[in-house]
Amino acid sequence: MESRVNENEQVQARDIAFLLFLTFLNVINYIDRQLIGVFANWIVPELDLSNFEFGLITGPIFIFFYAVMGLFMGIIADRVNRTRLIAFGLGLWSFLTVLSGAAKGFLSLALPRMFIGVGESTLAPAAISLLGDRFPAKWQGFVVGIFGMGVSIGLGLSLLIVAYLEPILGWRGCFYLLGGMGIVLALCMLLMRETPRRHLGEMQKENDISTNKGLLDGFSFRTVALDLRN
């Protein structure tokens, strides 16, 4: 039994690779989130937006849908295939980022940004749930810290994109590039297997224990209570 526990506590190279891949997706997530803000000096005059309109796009329109849908996505992540949920969200926000790059005015930019918030809200709850099942408890703080580094890295890279890629591609080209990259990564995510849920395995073990106990001791109140609880 002891060797089996130690075996379960071991972290393999593919687990680290999976963590780094999800962290990279988090980097892309935050680059995408910041891109419209850091390109304000180009977007506002070209689309003839007022400060109020641009404030709506970067503030309430995005944040409301991101915050509200984040709650629902956390619930959904507990019930569906999480790798596919991430792939769906990543594909959605990446496609809408491409549409944002083709915007001609307020509405054609506001509508994609609204649903980009929906797509981006899938990543954090599903990724943290996956990592929680993939790594042992003693690694949880480290794992979440690595995943969270994607926020700072993404913020920093968004500024570098403005400095070095905008003169070459323009703001629209940067949107197209990031969106296209995200679509490719979404397809890669679809190829990954779902990580078995740890709590389901523990529930199955408890069910097995209660069943064996019932066979040994007879059909007792304890067995009924355990079965009802599960």
Predicted feature locations:
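Cytosolic juxtamembrane N-terminal segment immediately preceding the first transmembrane helix
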Residues: 1-31, 45
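Conserved MFS/SLC helix-loop-helix module at the cytosolic interface between two early adjacent transmembrane helices
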Residues: 68-104
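Cytoplasmic helix-loop-helix junction between adjacent transmembrane helices
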Residues: 112-152
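Helix-breaking motifs and short loop linkers at transmembrane-helix boundaries and internal kinks
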Residues: 48, 81, 102-108, 136
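Residue-level signature of mid-helix packing/kink "hotspots" within the transmembrane helices
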Residues: 34, 63-71, 121, 155-156
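Extracellular/periplasmic helix-loop-helix junction of adjacent transmembrane segments
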Residues: 39-68
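Helix-loop-helix hairpin linking two adjacent transmembrane segments in secondary transporters
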Residues: 147-194
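Flexible cytoplasmic inter-helical loops of multi-pass small-molecule transporters
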Residues: 193-223
